[in-house]
Structures are given as structure tokens and as C-alpha cells.
Design a protein with these regions (language model features):
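N-terminal alpha-helical scaffold/docking segments in eukaryotic complex subunits
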Residues: 1-94, 165-225
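Eukaryote-skewed repeat-based solenoidal scaffolds used as protein-protein interaction platforms
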Residues: 80-198
Length: 225
């Protein structure tokens, strides 16, 4: 078992990974034992190569245990590498907080699409998550589908932290990219007349150009969603 007294969530994530890739348990322990930002950032970058990107595929007991630690949303889209990267970020937040901003900024700028997606999936797990709003907003403006999907789907961060105009823009971006609105955490509570009107315009534009409107546009019906 990976034990980290100051970082129980990180320890739990690493244990989940170690169960799935037991040959890498020693590496996970080695990195966790020396949680300086340089070591953690290197491990973050190497996660896919060392562990692969197979689905995390949690069972019911594992989901319940994570929920007890505050992770009560779906991790169905997470890979083993995503869980590991989330653990390294949480360790950096708990043990090297002064260096966390640089860590995140370097990975956001230099990491591949999978690393950037992992950053976004991990944002809700970080203390004082609101401070990373600019990182999420920058991803919203990007054009890499995998990165946008990590922000839109099964991620409570936007509904919790985005202001109305930014949240609405994200929903419209999701519609344009044909991402499933059913996987937007907290969408129902954030639907406004303004958003419903904008979504109706998207549908009208699609029909006018001979394209099918998004299948789950009904979720944005004002007073219904």
C-alpha cells in the first residue's frame, strides 16, 4: 500500500494505479517518497510511457472509497496515466505548493494533449481550485478535441467555478464539437434563458446549412433542463 499521511487522496489514487500495474509499484513509491516539484513534474510527463493509458475502470467499491474522499463524479473516462498524473499534482499541491503554478504552467505549455487533458481532469482535486480558473479558460478557447472533452465531460470544475458567460461559451463549444451534454456535471443548474437562446441559434444555423442539430440540445431548453 502507498501511504502518504499528508496526501490521503494522492495515496489512494496511487494505490489504485499500483493494483493495475503492479510492476510499477516500486516506481510509484520512489516518486512519492521524494515529492519535490522537479521529480513530480518529470514523473507527470513520463506517466503514459511508464504505465500506459488503459482505462482506470473502477469497480463499485473503489468508486465508493473515492467518493468518501470527495471525488463523487464519474472517472469513467480516466486512464491509468490520468490517475497517476492527478496524484502527482495533488502531491505537488500538498508538499511543494510554492512551485505548483510553475509546474502547471510548464505542462500546460509543453505537454502533449494527453498531459493537458490530465491537468484539466485534476483541477477539481486541487486545494483552492478557483485559482486555476485561467488554466481552464485557456483550454476552453483551444481547438484540441481531447483537451476540450476533458474540460467538458465528467468534470465538475466548470459548473463550480466558471462565471455565466464563460460557462455558456463552454456549452456552446461542446455543442459545436458534438460532445455529449449528458456528461456535463452540473449543467441543469446552470441553464439560463440566455444559454437556451444561444443554443437555439446553434440549432437553427445547423438546420440552415443542412446539418443535424445536436442530439441532446433538449437539455438546454429553458425551464426544462
Amino acid at each position: 500500500m502507498v501511504t502518504l499521511a499528508r496526501s490521503p487522496l494522492a495515496a489512494h489514487l496511487l494505490e489504485l494505479v499500483a493494483r493495475r500495474v503492479p510492476a510499477r509499484r516500486a516506481w510509484l513509491r520512489e516518486v512519492a517518497a521524494a515529492p519535490d516539484v522537479r521529480t513530480l513534474e518529470t514523473a507527470f510527463a513520463e506517466a503514459s510511457r511508464r504505465l500506459g493509458a488503459a482505462p482506470l475502470a473502477l469497480d463499485a467499491a473503489e468508486r465508493t472509497a473515492l467518493s468518501a474522499l470527495g471525488v463523487d463524479w464519474s472517472l469513467e473516462a480516466w486512464g491509468i496515466d490520468d490517475a497517476t498524473r492527478a496524484a502527482w499534482l495533488r502531491l505537488a499541491a500538498d508538499h511543494a505548493a510554492a512551485d505548483l503554478e510553475g509546474f502547471i504552467e510548464r505542462r500546460r505549455r509543453s505537454g502533449d494533449a494527453r498531459q493537458r487533458a490530465a491537468l484539466l481532469r485534476a483541477l477539481p482535486l486541487l486545494p483552492d481550485a478557483q485559482q486555476w480558473l485561467a488554466v481552464a479558460l485557456e483550454a476552453r478557447r483551444g481547438d484540441v478535441r481531447a483537451v476540450l472533452e476533458a474540460l467538458v465531460c465528467d468534470n465538475p470544475y466548470p459548473a463550480t467555478h466558471f462565471h455565466e458567460v464563460h460557462f455558456d461559451d463552454l456549452v456552446l463549444a461542446a455543442l459545436e464539437a458534438d460532445l455529449p451534454l449528458a456528461r456535463m456535471v452540473g449543467l441543469g443548474a446552470r441553464v439560463t434563458e440566455r444559454l437556451a437562446t444561444a443554443a437555439a441559434r446553434v440549432a437553427a444555423t445547423r438546420r440552415a446549412s443542412g446539418r443535424r442539430p445536436p442530439a441532446d440540445l433538449w437539455r438546454l431548453a429553458w425551464g426544462v433542463a
